[in-house]
Amino acid sequence: MSKTGITLLGISGSPRLKSTHYAVNAALDYARERHGAETDYFSVHAKTIGFCTHCDFCIRKKQGCIQDDAMSELYEKMLLADAWILASPVYQGQVSGQLKTVLDRCRAVAARDRHAFRDKVGMGICIGGDRSGGQEPSLQSLIGFYLINEMIPVGGGAFGANLGAAVWSRDKGAEGVKADEEGMAAVHRVVDRLIEMTRLVAGRRP
């Protein structure tokens, strides 16, 4: 059991094990070491995750998704966690196609129980090769997902991490992320708020 009683899931939406992989694991390490959270990690790297085809099996049968792939493992992790970190590289000003597919496939969970993710707390980390590389629009799309699923999105507050953690990799992978002191400070700031809000929710839940 963690010191906080909080289980935190980090999801890397990058097909590579570079900047996003590093940033998520750095955030999880910080949450574990600073706050005593229990952590779990999932990466889309080398995973088979099919697109949602809008077949409506999940709507008709209320038995989850008809596809049997890596999402089966992730669904379980998502449901068990109290809080999530969704992280993505920026592709064309938005989250990666791989992460978008993960989010689309969550329709099957909502079809069975539309409150399944209710009151879980979520944050975003988006990594761009440029300093102004589309991180904030990408973070906004993650916030939208959280709101649609009755989750509670958090940022780091004004002056530094408004919508979440925007990180600049300079297209240098993990080394670029490590070098972005401002970006990693934002990661820590948002994790602090994530843990704080998760504790508040747990304390007030009937």
Give residue spans per PLM region.
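Short, glycine-/small-residue-rich phosphate/pyrophosphate-handling segment
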Residues: 97, 112-159
